[in-house]
Amino acid sequence: MICTRFAPSPTGYLHIGGLRTALFNYLYARANGGKFVLRIEDTDLKRNSVEAANAIVEAFKWCGLDYDGEIVYQSSRFDLYKKYIQKLLDENKAYKCYMSKAELDTLRAEQEARKERPKYDGRYRDFNGIPPKGIDPVIRIKAPLSGTIEFDDGIKGSMKFNANDILDDFIIARSDGTPTYNFTVVIDDALMGITDVIRGDDHLSNTPKQIVLYNALGFKIPKFYHVAMINGSDGRKLSKRHGATDVMEYKRMGYLPEALLNFLVRLGWSHGDDEIFSLDDMKKYFDPNHISKSSSTFNQSKLEWLNAYYIKNSSNKRLIKELKNFNINIENHPKKELLIDSFKERAKTLADMAKGIDSLLSRPKTYEQKAFNKFINENSKNLLQKFSEILDAQNLKAKEIEEKTMQFLEKEGEKLKNLAQPLRVAITGTSVSPSIFEVIEILGVNEIKLRIENLIKNKESL
């Protein structure tokens, strides 16, 4: 059975690249009826954050990514790691190294002077003497001194490394006894039955070391898939300088989780020419063998397009609920359905939608200077005044308002744009709004007449 995992370190928020990695692992497991587990790699007790760990779980919940079983925390497994470190020591596959920091620094300087790659020289590999006093040893694995390390990467294909070029007897336990990253990963992946590891190709250099440990411990090596990085629009690795990278920041900016997942799954994976994928579609079609070898580019416009699509196709009931996160509560508004319909067609984010609704429902305290100067003059004021006087019937529907308005304009010999733009300024304080006919139905005749009156009386229009 396929078993995948997502194993973040809780030293910060869950970033976009991490969510894509989690999504790929999740989809591969679900597409094959397998298991997907969440493991928190919190062995670095100094840098760990409970808040960060909780934020990862919160992001999973928001995105609808469920995991199997309980969350595994590495910090609760130190005894297990010590057991396997001792096993390697007992089998003479690892050893204690008493080399001091000063000795390591000297060795590194000498190697760099000779233009050699800095690496540990193995001086304690077969040490049988009396250990030096005052030094707490690290534990090093006995890495192969020659030969090659090979594996078939599901994305990059056949990978081959010369052991002597890339390996030394690397540390598996620090001098304080805490295990290192590569060691804990191997122990946990093996004991948790992880069959496939999909991760960023920044981990490619770790893979030979982990294979050494799998072989030393007699564990089965999982299938590796190393995914190319996500780049910003400038071709450099995605970072904060390109905008938000925190997954939950996208929620706060008004993106829907299904839009974000749809966007991320297409960063490196494709299924024909399709662009729109529900989570169920992804589960049905996802195959890691179809992940591109090339880096993908984070395209903000594409994300906005997808988000607009999902907003447009969301139920009004859901959008009304989502807007409460932006302090917009229209649950009891008599025209809530029309209000949502008027904005969902053109909104790129929920934040945009909330801002538009708030602008519409709140009487303008000021007027956008550019719009005011362009559309408000003596002629437009007179036209607004006359239009206000014909708004006498209550509870008119948008279609009826449109008919009444067109009759008025025909009588006055005016075009719609000569009324619509000044009316938008009067209603919202800007030149932007949904259809003025829908706006009049939403706000009601009395409110429209009041806003027209307020604009005409405004000192800026004198």
Curated annotation (Swiss-Prot):
Q: Which gene encodes it?
A: gltX1
Give yes or no: UniProt keyword Disulfide bond: no
Entry protein name? Glutamate--tRNA ligase 1
Source species of the chain: Campylobacter hominis (strain ATCC BAA-381 / DSM 21671 / CCUG 45161 / LMG 19568 / NCTC 13146 / CH001A)
Residues annotated for ATP binding in this entry = 240
Described purpose of this protein according to its UniProt entry: Catalyzes the attachment of glutamate to tRNA(Glu) in a two-step reaction: glutamate is first activated by ATP to form Glu-AMP and then transferred to the acceptor end of tRNA(Glu).
The EC number on file is 6.1.1.17
* Keyword annotations of the record: Aminoacyl-tRNA synthetase, ATP-binding, Cytoplasm, Ligase, Nucleotide-binding, Protein biosynthesis
One GO term (biological process): glutamyl-tRNA aminoacylation
The lineage, from the top, is:
Bacteria, Pseudomonadati, Campylobacterota, Epsilonproteobacteria, Campylobacterales
Instruction: Give the family, as the similarity comment puts it.
Output: Belongs to the class-I aminoacyl-tRNA synthetase family. Glutamate--tRNA ligase type 1 subfamily.
